[in-house]
From Swiss-Prot:
Gene Ontology CC terms: small ribosomal subunit
Keyword Magnesium: no
GO biological process: translation
Species of provenance: Photorhabdus laumondii subsp. laumondii (strain DSM 15139 / CIP 105565 / TT01)
Signal sequence residues: none
UniProt subunit comment: Part of the 30S ribosomal subunit. Contacts proteins S9 and S11.
SUPFAM superfamilies named in the record: Ribosomal protein S7 (SSF47973)
The protein's name: Small ribosomal subunit protein uS7
Family matches, as HAMAP family: Ribosomal_uS7_B (MF_00480_B)
Family matches, as CDD domains: uS7_Bacteria
GO molecular function annotations of the record: rRNA binding; structural constituent of ribosome; tRNA binding
This protein's encoding gene: rpsG
Membership in a protein family: Belongs to the universal ribosomal protein uS7 family.
Length: 156
């Protein structure tokens, strides 16, 4: 840890099309090898498909999908007297968003559809309907935290 001053987190510029910081972060997570314009094209195409399917606004549909994937609790390893416990801890809001976006992108990459835009659109629509791989990942994390509730007093 630095002994001098703590450097604040950088402000992220909102995305050019919708003016959303959350969407800009999502584009950055999807981006590979610094190809931001490609990532933006994929995200915008996926959002267009998602909006047509759901009949909602682009950002509204995206927010709904993200809400259904956001975890509230997770487990962290804590070593106590030679044994390691999985201690359930609450997830901070910024990390909730980051995890949800990461899980959606991972799940979309594992899908077997043709283009990445289609895979992302399908995963987002599944997430909006509370199904799909990303939602399953959140359920697994919650189940793990529930199973280890007995170790909650080891929180730090």
């Amino acid at each position: 840890m630095p002994r001098r001053r703590v450097i604040g987190q950088r402000k992220i510029l909102p995305d050019p099309k919708f003016g959303s910081e959350l969407l800009a972060k999502f584009v950055n997570i999807l981006m590979v090898d610094g190809k931001k314009s490609t990532a933006e094209a994929i995200v915008y195409s996926a959002l267009e498909t998602l909006a047509q399917r759901s009949g909602k606004e682009h950002l509204e549909a995206f927010e709904l999908a993200l809400d259904n994937v956001r975890p509230t609790v997770e487990v962290k390893s804590r070593r106590v007297g030679g044994s390691t416990y999985q201690v359930p801890v609450e997830v901070r809001p910024v990390r909730r968003n980051a995890l949800a976006m990461r899980w959606i992108v991972e799940a979309a990459r594992k899908r077997g559809d043709k283009s990445m835009a289609l895979r992302l659109a399908n995963e987002l629509s599944d997430a909006a309907e509370n199904k799909g791989t990303a939602v399953k990942k959140r359920e697994d994390v919650h189940r793990m935290a529930e199973a280890n509730k007995a170790f909650a007093h080891y929180r730090w």
